[in-house]
Amino acid sequence: MALIQTAFIWVAYAVAVGIVALIAAIFTYTYQTPRDRSALVSTVTIITLTSLLATVLLLPVDIALVSSTTSKLGAKKDWATPETVHNILLTLKIVYYALYSFDAVLCLLVIPFTYFFYEEYDEIDSEEGTQTFGQRFLSAAKYTLFFVALVVILFLVGFFVPVAKNRGSDMDLDYFKRLLAENHGERALTFALGLLISLGTLLYILYTSVGLALLPISFIKSAPSISAPQLSETTASALEQNRERQRQLEGRNAGRDGGLSAKDQRELEALHREERTLVRRERLAAESRGDGKSFIVRAWTKTCAIFRPLKLIGGILLLILSLIIWVSMLITGIDKAKNSFCKQHCGYILGSINIFQPINWIFVKSSIVFPIDYVLMALLVLFLFSSSVTGIAAIGLRFLWVKLFEIRKGHTSPQALLMATVMLTLIILAINYSIAMLIAPQYAIYGAQTFCANPTKFPGDQPDCSNHPELIKTCSELSSGEGAEKVCTPSVVSTFLNRVTVNFPFFGALAFWAQFVFLAIFLIVFVTALFRTPKLDLSEIDEDAEADEEEGLLASTGRRFGATWQDIRGKTQNTSGGAAGRGIRGDDDHNDD
């Protein structure tokens, strides 16, 4: 029975990794620009994102495996011998160390090498045969040596840096003694992870907080809708007026010596530019309607239009989830700041939950029946990941106030994609800390484990609480006694993260207090976004259409226009003002605004 249960847990994890690999591939191909697509960049991005998400999604597996060793009566199951439990923990440690090490190598070595390898490519030299693969490889490797030196220095510092020592009676518990790392190799990896988490926390409080506020609101308050039929009609009307005005100018100056006057010439040139814009916009509207496409494509377009109103409901649900996450983090933060017995000396580890925390309660209750908690954790991780992507897309890749790259669907360069992947690597490490330490702290450490506090008659016997349910206690860091020591098994990830904060208290204090900055930024952006009306940027649409037209890719990246009944019917509504009254401005008029 134990073997079947363990196998089921690992199979569920394998399925989850397969799903996140698909999500990583969709993310990569959705955001990268088609005309500069690189197979190497795409592969590295997909592998990196899959590895990162797999690292975070190992938490429910960790909880399920350690929780499976205990019964509802607070005793170890018959098959859960000390040797069996040790083997389970050893397997989890190997997987964790492998994933964390792989993440670090990808972030600090593989992605920089891929960035320089792509930058070294010269299309003209490659076609002429003056640039070979070996030259590009050696040149990229030369620039990557800096990052190799950085990794070596990082691990050397972690290998020799002194760790925190026992700090009095507060740290005398067995749980905290085990956290004080004595192995130098483990200490080096702990230091490196703590440094990467700290760097990721700085990005996390900026990008994830903004995305967590903007993502639900973007579903609810989308930009003003323009239906494809309405856009087509207004564009056709404006195009007709444009060409009529051109004919008037040409007719008025037909018999004039020297041709058009300077004023008329400038107006005619502006009309020509506007005409090109309107023609592109007309073709774009036709693409969004599915004109010239198969019946399946047209049916899919109308089906999407029908279900777009569900976007509002989804936005409301995501908004509720965002607020619950915010409240849960605030509750845990206050609880830790007030009730942590070791404060900044151990990264504000909380002995036990003192205030009801909704998300932690949901996960603890759902962990009783696997894989309910796994599904919930996967959804939570993907939501925070999507929020991070939304934040990066909204703010862009910046150095101080200078925007270096822009992250947009279908318009992200390979360099920007690699830099965004590095940022997401660090952010996901910070998300892993936030989930385990603030969002669901009790669940992340012991899950639903309990222990029987009823004393045993003989040493080595299992405690029996079948007739004393009131003596069944919840496992926590402060649990003591023979029953807790034999039954309560902390998760590997919580032990690893707590080892970072206990051995290097600076990292723990930074990661903890940064959560309050995260909450403050979320609140500011959330309130601002509630009262800010989104605008439809037609100039951006025109620029996208022009770029796509130049590359012959207009059909593959047509933009979606709002969800209205007109999209479903394929016809425009009759309005008193008409298209001519509203019109559509060209590039020059738009820029004048």
UniProtKB/Swiss-Prot annotation:
Entry function = Probable lysosomal cobalamin transporter. Required to export cobalamin from lysosomes allowing its conversion to cofactors.
Q: Which GO terms describe its molecular function?
A: cobalamin binding
Compositional bias per record (Basic and acidic residues), positions renumbered to this chain: 241-255, 584-593
Q: Where is this region: Disordered?
A: 237-260, 564-593
The positions making up the signal sequence are none
Name it: Probable lysosomal cobalamin transporter
A Gene Ontology annotation in the biological process aspect, one of them, is:
protein localization to vacuole
Is this entry keyworded Signal?
no
What family does the database annotate? Belongs to the LIMR family. LMBRD1 subfamily.
Record's keyword terms, sorted: Cobalamin, Cobalt, Glycoprotein, Lysosome, Membrane, Transmembrane, Transmembrane helix, Transport
What membrane topology is given?
A: Multi-pass membrane protein
Where in or outside the cell it occurs: the entry states: Lysosome membrane
Q: Which residues are glycosylated?
A: 574
Q: Which segments cross the bilayer?
A: 7-27, 46-66, 94-114, 144-164, 195-215, 312-332, 349-369, 375-395, 419-439, 506-526
The UniProt entry, under Pfam families, shows: LMBR1
Cellular component, GO annotation = vacuolar membrane
